[in-house]
Amino acid sequence: MSLCHRNYMLAGLGTLIVILSGIASAETKYTVVAPPVCVNNLGESVSFFSRPTTQGRVAAGMANRDNDGNPVIYRANYEKATPAFQKFVDFHECAHHQVGHVDQPHPPRNSYDHLMNESIADCVAILRVREEDNESYRLVIDGLVDAMTAIGFPKTSTDSRISNVTNCYENYGSSAEFIEGVLNSERAR
């Protein structure tokens, strides 16, 4: 595993567990949804692996490359999140592969670049919700609010994230067009 991928994994894991959490009561168990189709910006199919833990109380995902360099998404504790929120997390993690974040050095946590990467992934994710599972939009928004509130994010952070997701959902074209715009912007750098 390259240093870039290792740093992405280590820095991203903590952030994604906190940012992408669907919290449910300890007794609530949901059916785990099948992962969506995910192909990265290099045309490689992304594999999903479940890694349930006995200690985790939140659902989380992490986009990375495995030790052999294959693109992967690790899913943890999905049975603790609603199916709608599970799909959003999968789409969000897939987006990190689709726009090439996984193959770039991971920016410092909470830096402008890190937050921009997360906003981009949220936007792609909600566009895919609109395209593939539109009836779950409200459930995704509710899941984000519930999770961020339960974790202790300030209301301003929650409101900002919901505003970004809603703006993407209401005002952008397809996820493919959005991804192409991000990739073109990266190429122009």
Predicted feature locations:
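Bacterial N-terminal signal peptides that target proteins for export
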Residues: 2-12
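N-terminal signal peptide c-region/cleavage motif recognized by signal peptidases
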Residues: 21-23
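Auxiliary, metal-adjacent structural segments of Zn-dependent hydrolase domains
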Residues: 26-68
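Active-site scaffold of zinc-dependent metalloenzymes
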Residues: 50-83, 94-102
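Soluble non-cytosolic domains of exported or imported proteins
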Residues: 80-85, 89, 111-119
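Post-HExxH zinc-binding segment in Zn-dependent metallohydrolases
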Residues: 111-137
